[in-house]
From Swiss-Prot:
One of its GO terms (molecular function) is 23S rRNA (guanine(1835)-N(2))-methyltransferase activity. It is found in: Cytoplasm. Its main location: cytoplasm. It is an enzyme of class 2 (transferase). Keywords: Cytoplasm, Methyltransferase, rRNA processing, S-adenosyl-L-methionine, Transferase. Specifically methylates the guanine in position 1835 (m2G1835) of 23S rRNA. Its EC number is 2.1.1.174. It comes from the Bacteria. This is Ribosomal RNA large subunit methyltransferase G. HAMAP family: 23SrRNA_methyltr_G (MF_01859). It holds the Pfam family MTS.
Length: 376
């Protein structure tokens, strides 16, 4: 794994977060390099107030903090922690960290923008930029060229303003935009829809996974949520919009709940959904975190888990493995981890390695998914 970014006779040492010993993915990509090259070639003669959106692990924030005032906005707890560590590692100047739920800083003079994965999140960020920026503030975005579609550029033109693109470089392309389109009425960040068969109405902020409909895995898992008066503390690990906790709280109203996700928008969506869909006052805590880092051991009776297999733009299985390891530490003796995953992901083998063959059982399966339960 390459950890040294060398450009313009400068060097940064950059790691992903968490910094795993067997990590093979680097902490920046060619898109970061393209943005750095572009801005450096502008030879800006005065310090700028640079707003950086969706900086993966702080490469852009580290680079530009040397000469400019930098604000980094991200929906990712993991990205923010990675940026903090890389800023400290490289003895960089202080960078202001915000979530994408926060307001766009009014003093911004340049916006640099790693495009998010989903168009709902992109649309939200563009509308927030349009509300705040004047037309003379340049917005420069980057992504892999194959991910910048005509529909992507139409979103820029509709919600922000005049848009053009660069030539491709190392399979990446820049998008240049200025905030000059007609101001639109405020767009609600929340998408709402019903799950009739489970008597729920779910609120979804723009960057929540499967925010426009209930994903098939969660729908299957809802049919198999345990109901047991002995469940005192239930953790929803990788909670997303909190749909599993809503069902679990409806079935186990006396339990304490802890909902954990690395997305700030997921955490806020989960909070809204428990408040709206659980009639009794639920004892719940909502935590943006990297898995169960910092949690005490042997505190949970049940952990529900629908693991992601993406970190930023990369496909990886280390998140599921960390979740399973953390769950084993945090579960009480006799506590259970209940996991859903696609059949091809092989979670049964991972769980048996951790919990032992005889302690892992199949709860349910269909043509696409398996639900597994591991007992500590």
């Amino acid at each position: 794994m390459k950890t040294e970014l060398n450009l313009f006779d400068r060097q940064l040492t950059l790691f992903r977060y968490p910094n795993n010993a067997n990590e093979t993915l680097q902490a920046w990509d060619a898109g970061d390099e393209y943005l750095i090259n572009y801005v450096e070639e502008l030879a800006l003669d005065t310090p700028q107030n640079i707003l950086i959106l969706n900086d993966h692990f702080g490469a852009l924030s580290c680079w530009f903090s040397a000469q400019h005032q930098v604000t980094m906005m991200s929906d990712s707890f993991i990205s923010q922690q990675g940026a903090k560590e890389n800023l400290q590692r490289n003895q960089c100047r202080e960078v202001k960290l915000l979530t994408t739920l926060d307001a766009i800083p009014t003093e911004t003079s340049l916006v640099l923008f790693q495009l998010p994965k989903n168009n709902r999140h992109l649309t939200w960020q563009l509308t927030q930029l349009r509300k705040t920026l004047s037309p003379d503030v340049p917005v420069v975005a980057v992504n892999k060229a194959k991910e910048i579609h005509t529909s992507t550029l139409k979103l820029f033109e509709k919600y922000l303003g005049t848009t053009k693109t660069s030539l491709a470089w190392k399979k990446h392309r820049l998008v240049f935009c200025q905030a000059d389109c007609a101001q639109m009425n405020d767009i609600s960040p929340v998408t709402r829809w019903n799950v009739e068969e489970h008597k729920m109405t779910l609120n979804n902020l723009p960057n929540v996974y499967s925010g426009e409909s209930l994903d098939l895995g969660a729908r299957f898992m809802l049919e198999h949520i345990p109901q047991d008066d002995n469940l005192k503390h239930i953790i929803d690990l990788g909670c997303g919009n909190g749909v599993l906790s809503v069902k679990a709280a409806q079935l186990n109203p006396k339990a304490k709940f802890t909902l954990v996700d690395e997305s700030y928008m997921a955490i806020e969506s989960a909070r809204l959904n428990l408040q709206e869909n659980v009639t009794a006052s639920v004892d719940a805590e909502y935590i943006a975190n990297n898995c169960l880092d910092g949690f005490a051991g042997e505190i949970a009776d049940l952990i529900l888990c629908n693991p992601p297999f993406h970190q930023q733009q990369a496909i990886t299985d280390h998140i599921a493995w960390q979740m399973f390891c953390d769950a084993k530490r945090v579960l009480k003796r006799g506590g259970k981890l209940q996991v859903i995953g696609n059949r091809h992901l092989g979670y049964d083998g991972k769980l048996k390695r951790l919990y032992g063959d005889k302690n892992v059982k199949l709860v349910a399966s269909n043509s696409k998914f398996v639900i597994l339960q591991a007992t500590k």
